[in-house]
Amino acid sequence: IVYDKKTAKSAGSFIWDNEVGGMFIVTATAFKNTNADSLLEDITRIVDSFGKEPVTDKELEKVKNSVENDYINNMQTIMGKADALASFWTFHKNTGLINTMVDEYLSITKEDILKAAKKYLTRDNRVVITYLPKNGKEN
């Protein structure tokens, strides 16, 4: 939607994990001439594809490299280590995961991702929020 269709000037996603539950959040900023409903259709098509076909080997390798790099960089500071220990205690009651969690992430397979996407990334399991300019006009 950013590089090929050019319906959004920016797009991204992230996971917001919480103690009781979490969210997978997708954001996109439309170009002035892009209709919000059209952009939502494009995003929906992309998210729906996660549950239909496995990610490619290249995509999985890219994500694993990013996870490992982020984890190593985060462990370079006392604050990063403290935050990781606090998170592991809050979510798992196990600070020892600081030594093994990155390996668990790196062991995830394409099939694991496909199974999770089919379970959690369904149309019935989402909330859509659209922010429009102050004047209320999409274009």
Regions found by a protein language model. Name each.
Residues 1-52, 57-106, 124-133:
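M16 family metallopeptidases and their MPP-like homologs
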Residues 107-139:
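In a subset of proteins, long, contiguous C-terminal domains/tails are tracked
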